[in-house]
Structures are given as C-alpha cells and as structure tokens.
Amino acid sequence: MATLFIADLHLSLHEPAITAGFLRFLRHEAIHADALYILGDLFDTWIGDDDPQPLHATIAAELYALHQLGITCYFVHGNRDFLIGKRFARQSGMTLLPTENVVDLYGQKILILHGDTLCTDDLAYQKFRRRVHNPFIQQLFLLLPLSLRLKIAAKMRASSQQANQQKSQQIMDVNPEQVLERLRHYQVKTMIHGHTHRPAIHQVDLGKSYGRRAVLGAWHEEGSMIKVTPQNIELISFPF
C-alpha cells in the first residue's frame, strides 16, 4: 500500500529526457500505487487545453492508461500550468483538486498544495499570481489566438526568470508563519508541497507537538517523489 506524490516536472519539448523519465515512472512505479498526486507544474507552460502540442497528447494518453488500471491521478495546479482545464483532465483521466486540499491517507490527514501560496515574502509574485488567477483575465487570455498566447507566455516566462535572478533565496522560499497558519487552520500535522525545488522533510514546531512539512524536488537531473504508506512518509530521488 502506497500513495505517490510528484511535482515540478516542467515537461516541455526541450527536455525529452525528463519526459522519458516520467513515462518510465508511470509505467514502472505509478502502476503499483494506490493513487498518484501531481502537485503542480507538470508542464513548463500551459496556454490552454486547445494547444495541439504532441507532447500533451502523449502525456494525456499515458495518464489515461493509468486511469484505466484503476489508479486515480489527482492534480493540483501549479504556477506554470494553472490553466489546465476540464478538457485535458478528461483526456488524461485526472481529477482536478482545489489549490489547497486535505486528504485522508491510511488514517492520516495531510494538507497538499503546490506551495506557491506559502511564499508570501515574494510580494511581486503574489501580486502577479492574484492577477493571472482572476477568472475574467483567464477567459480573455484563452480567447486569444494560440500564436499570440505563445508569445505572451514566452515573454512572461522571460520576465519571471530575469526577476528571480534578482531575488534572494529566502524571499522565494516559504514563509514559516504561513506554514504554521495552514497547519493550524486545517488542523493537520503533515503538509506536502512542491514549488520551491528544495526537497526535504522538515520538522515543524506546533507548540505542544511537532508536525512535518515534506517538500518535493524538481525533476532536473533526477526524479523526485514522496511515498506515503500506512507506516511512513518517505522522500525518494531516483535516476530517469
């Protein structure tokens, strides 16, 4: 019995090794799981479910094959692929989840999220996030021609990379008070997230007890997953 979590694969046509590694993961690891949770940034960018990229169809087919085996795949939107919608979810057999969600695994309640909402010290990003998550702005963007959406996404990505080079590592990490607030609000002792690309399992002082914050790694040189069993929560890295 095991439930698997992954995040921050940033799949794109420019990184075929990561795509191949993910397909192997689905075929050899995920098929043995009770469920698979993808906590955002499965793709490096997403400009709409109508984008005819062959990569999207390949990933959808592989995820749907997992679905047909009776293994549910849950998806939490990330900061790169927040526009993944119901159409792609149907094609891939994924179940879309809210930004923050409490799941009960083997009798243990766990808060799961992408993680960008915890990085409140990055004021510029949080302002950007509020803007692009406005439903009206999203609808307007999706009405634009694909070619224009591609150009806008590329420009936004370039601006983001340039801005991040000028930010401190501390600003781009989670705010500890936000972690405590979420754990207390949802009345849980365990949190799993991605986004920061800093894989670790942290102990969190809750006052009268201790909690855990498990952080997934990004798929760059190797894969990263968290395996939850009735006995343990384990952070695992593995070669592609």
Curated annotation (Swiss-Prot):
Its cofactor is Mn(2+). Mn(2+) 1 binds at residues 8, 10, 41, 197. One of its GO terms (molecular function) is manganese ion binding. It is a peripheral membrane protein. It is an enzyme of class 3 (hydrolase). The keyword Cell membrane applies. It is found in: Cell inner membrane. Substrate binds at residues 79-80, 122, 160, 164, 167, 195. It catalyses: UDP-2-N,3-O-bis[(3R)-3-hydroxytetradecanoyl]-alpha-D-glucosamine + H2O = 2-N,3-O-bis[(3R)-3-hydroxytetradecanoyl]-alpha-D-glucosaminyl 1-phosphate + UMP + 2 H(+). Its EC number is 3.6.1.54. Keywords: Cell inner membrane, Cell membrane, Hydrolase, Lipid A biosynthesis, Lipid biosynthesis, Lipid metabolism, Manganese, Membrane, Metal-binding. Transmembrane segments: none annotated. GO terms for biological process: lipid A biosynthetic process. It comes from the Bacteria. Pathway: Glycolipid biosynthesis; lipid IV(A) biosynthesis; lipid IV(A) from (3R)-3-hydroxytetradecanoyl-[acyl-carrier-protein] and UDP-N-acetyl-alpha-D-glucosamine: step 4/6. GO terms for cellular component: cytoplasm; extrinsic component of plasma membrane. Binds 2 Mn(2+) ions per subunit in a binuclear metal center. CDD domains: MPP_YbbF-LpxH (cd07398). Hydrolyzes the pyrophosphate bond of UDP-2,3-diacylglucosamine to yield 2,3-diacylglucosamine 1-phosphate (lipid X) and UMP by catalyzing the attack of water at the alpha-P atom. Involved in the biosynthesis of lipid A, a phosphorylated glycolipid that anchors the lipopolysaccharide to the outer membrane of the cell. This is UDP-2,3-diacylglucosamine hydrolase. It comes from Pectobacterium atrosepticum (strain SCRI 1043 / ATCC BAA-672). The gene is lpxH.
